[in-house]
Amino acid sequence: LGGRTTLDALVVTLSHSRMFAVIWALSRSLLWWLEAHNRAFERLGGIPWTVRPDNVRTAVAWGAGPWARLQEGYASYARQLGFIVDPCRVRTASDKGKVERRGRDVRAFLGALKDVCFLRLEDLQAATDERVRARVQRLICPVTGRSILASWEAEQAALLALPATLPEPFDVQVNRTVTDDCLVSFEGRQYEVPFTSMRRTVQVRGCAGTVEIYGVDGQHLARYPRGTACRLLLDQRHAEGEGDDRVRRPTPLGRVGQAIVLERSWEVARRPIDDYLELVRRLA
């Protein structure tokens, strides 16, 4: 981590079984907030139907409780995974009593780790997971009278199932209208999407190392590397497939085009012009 580093921890507690997860993060940015949610849901073995966050800026844009306006990025993430966000009310201890009690407990039983030097965040997380696992075997769930671990194992069937792939955490999200050239603009670059999305509105997310593009129905349309030197990112696969009653399939490339055009424009390899001339002669 490069010396002593101040970290934040996300503590997620299931209301029924009191099972919990502690996820360490380097910041409170939206990117890390969503990544921490992903890791917490994985450890809990599912997704709660309702999530009640405190009124932190990464979750709530303004207001609190039922009158809160959620951050659009967090709201979009919740819709994609299917859970409802129900922020805490101001000065209402009953709304977050369980997790605050768990937070005090976490500080106590993880106190021994503060004097240990961890070179990687992953090592600290592994040590934390180990202590959490031991803790839930000893603590008793007040609802069931059994251990938190045993109560959680019974509760898992009531949680929403984890998707095959959790959403890639993102720090920027915008809506864009696809041009007639099947391109969308984002961060000074243009990205190609499947031709059937022409003139439709899509959702573009800037993730840690990629740009993810989704349709309005949540369908994943395209993935590109983020922040490339290339300003026009084309993927020839997006011109394949059948058209529909709204859009016809683009005219396929000819022999020369198929031989010269790169499948992914950002993976351009520099070649002498003589190589292209020789290629054209062979195909002529």
Residue spans for each PLM region:
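RNase H-like two-metal-ion nuclease catalytic core shared by retroviral integrases
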Residues: 53-54, 64-65, 83-108, 120-124
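Protein C-terminal end segments and domain termini
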Residues: 207-284
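Acidic/histidine-rich, metal-coordinating catalytic segments
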Residues: 46-66
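Active-site-proximal acidic segments at structured loop/helix or strand boundaries
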Residues: 103-205
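Short conserved beta-strand segments at catalytic cores or DNA/RNA-binding microdomains
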Residues: 4-18, 25-26, 52, 77, ...
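Active-site beta-loop-alpha junctions of metal-dependent nucleic acid enzymes
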Residues: 7, 22-50, 227-233
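Short, conserved catalytic/metal-binding motifs centered on acidic residues
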Residues: 1, 18, 51-54, 78, ...
